[in-house]
């Protein structure tokens, strides 16, 4: 029917607008990062596998991480800078950024990383420090 076609076009326009806004935001963010830093380290995450995970599903595909990483890669390369990819099996979240001890279990619901050495911080900040240090180690070799 005519109404169905009209509504389908409206939905398509909404999706196009969202796609355009996401792309614009990611371009601006990647530009700001490449202007500010000479070396950027990222975790080499398997986005396809995360998208198929029951816990994350479509939200992982909607965030545009793969597109963002590609933008960072080509912009850094274009400026003669470096993107360091940390292996996806590196225990960035489970490793203590102070003492180096690796936790055996760390659930996604645990938002604060607590170690027996007394280190206590946001788990994402702990992972970011570990990724930075692993990138430094990789570049030194």
Feature map (PLM): residue ranges:
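Positively charged, helix-rich recognition surfaces that bind polyanionic ligands
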Residues: 1-141
């Amino acid at each position: 029917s005519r109404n169905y076609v009209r509504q389908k076009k409206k939905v398509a326009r909404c999706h196009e607008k969202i796609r355009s806004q996401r792309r614009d935001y990611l371009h601006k963010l990647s530009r700001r990062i490449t202007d500010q830093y000479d070396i950027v380290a990222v975790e080499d995450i398997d986005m396809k596998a995360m998208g198929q995970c029951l816990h994350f599903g479509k939200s992982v595909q909607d965030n545009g991480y793969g597109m963002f990483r590609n933008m960072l890669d080509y912009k850094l390369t274009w400026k003669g800078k470096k993107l360091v990819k940390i292996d996806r099996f590196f225990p960035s979240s489970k490793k203590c950024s102070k003492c180096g001890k690796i936790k055996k279990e760390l659930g996604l619901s645990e938002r604060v990383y607590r170690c027996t050495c007394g280190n206590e911080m946001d788990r994402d900040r702990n992972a970011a420090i570990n990724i930075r240090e692993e990138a430094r180690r990789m570049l030194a070799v």
